[in-house]
Amino acid sequence: AGDILDAYPLPVTGVLRPGVKTLAGLAGGAPLGVIATKASIDSGAFRRELERYGLERGVIYTACPDFVPLIESGHYSPDDALIREAVARYLRPMKDAGVGAILLGCTHYGLISAAIEDYMGAETRLVSASECAARELSDKLRELDMTGGCGEERYLTSGETGDFGRMAAIFLGWQPKRGAEH
């Protein structure tokens, strides 16, 4: 992260910390949950960040390796049988434990938040890591008075540039005018 901050004189916000901070603020009597990709869960990054808030216990971490492929293949409606089955399979231990809040630790997972809420119930708070990061970045830009004027759109992806337009339309609800680059 230091290299990025040194190379670009712009505010940089990661996805992990803002979401974890919000989740930690919801800690109370009920356990908390974190769902993310297998690589993210296995890295221990969420665990280490939550430990900074004194939350060494009472957190259930669950890797959900089927979520991203399902979402990217168009299965994200709360009525979709494949998503409903995957949500139930991965989140059953959290439901049984009575978690009070779940961090959606992957940017894709916001697309299935309705299916997660349907399964877990409205009393379980869902925290979107991507929404928390966007809010933090927006706040930083306002503080630095960098919200006015015109900007330009530039999309960078670590994935396939050919898939970008289709996926962007799903995530954004509109088709970007420009394609993505690596």
Where are these regions (language model features)?
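Non-catalytic structural scaffold of enzyme domains
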Residues: 1-182
